[in-house]
């Protein structure tokens, strides 16, 4: 069975409370339950991880990539400047789908650039928390095709 990591970056632990007009009212716990349910329907295993610390996210990738078939990541604020996270994702040579709940291209100028996008097979942005579920379906198809 394929195993996919779903990584939530900084401040995503505050979903449901943080700027609900931008990110909605679902808590991270509820989002994770939806992810687990969809993964079960798709017959894949998911490892869900959240950290507010760049190094912990990189360590998680390093420590787990050999058991993974792909990575779904919402890097949060790390999207715009974390070359170290970008390099960690590139180094493990797995398909990566980048997810953003809000449309980063409709927000402040500094949010328009993603350093992660260049190592991702695709990016889902602005479709709310459903973006995680679309990413699961996409990564399953990418893994089946074996090309990324």
From Swiss-Prot:
Pathways per UniProt: Metabolic intermediate biosynthesis; chorismate biosynthesis; chorismate from D-erythrose 4-phosphate and phosphoenolpyruvate: step 3/7
Return the SUPFAM superfamilies for the record: Type II 3-dehydroquinate dehydratase
Which CDD domains does this one have? DHQase_II (cd00466)
Annotated active site:
23 (proton acceptor), 100 (proton donor)
Q: Which reaction is the catalytic activity of this chain?
A: 3-dehydroquinate = 3-dehydroshikimate + H2O
InterPro entries referenced in this protein's UniProt entry, alphabetically: DHquinase_II, DHquinase_II_CS, DHquinase_II_sf
Q: Where does substrate bind?
A: 74, 80, 87, 101-102, 111
- Biological processes per GO annotation: amino acid biosynthetic process; aromatic amino acid family biosynthetic process; chorismate biosynthetic process; quinate catabolic process
Tell me which stretches of the chain form a coiled coil.
none
EC nos: 4.2.1.10
What molecular function terms (GO) are annotated for this protein?
A: 3-dehydroquinate dehydratase activity
Which residues does the annotation list for site: Transition state stabilizer?
18
**Alphabetical keyword list:** Amino-acid biosynthesis, Aromatic amino acid biosynthesis, Lyase
For the protein in the UniProt heading, the enzyme class is lyase
Q: Which PANTHER family match?
A: CATABOLIC 3-DEHYDROQUINASE (PTHR21272:SF3)
Family membership, please give it: Belongs to the type-II 3-dehydroquinase family.
> How is the quaternary structure described?
Homododecamer.
Summarize the protein's role. Answer: Catalyzes a trans-dehydration via an enolate intermediate.
Spell out the NCBIfam families in the cross-references: aroQ (TIGR01088), PRK05395.1-2 (NF003805), PRK05395.1-3 (NF003806), PRK05395.1-4 (NF003807)
Question: What name does the UniProt record give this protein?
Answer: 3-dehydroquinate dehydratase
Q: Which organism is it from?
A: Halothermothrix orenii (strain H 168 / OCM 544 / DSM 9562)
Q: Which gene encodes it?
A: aroQ
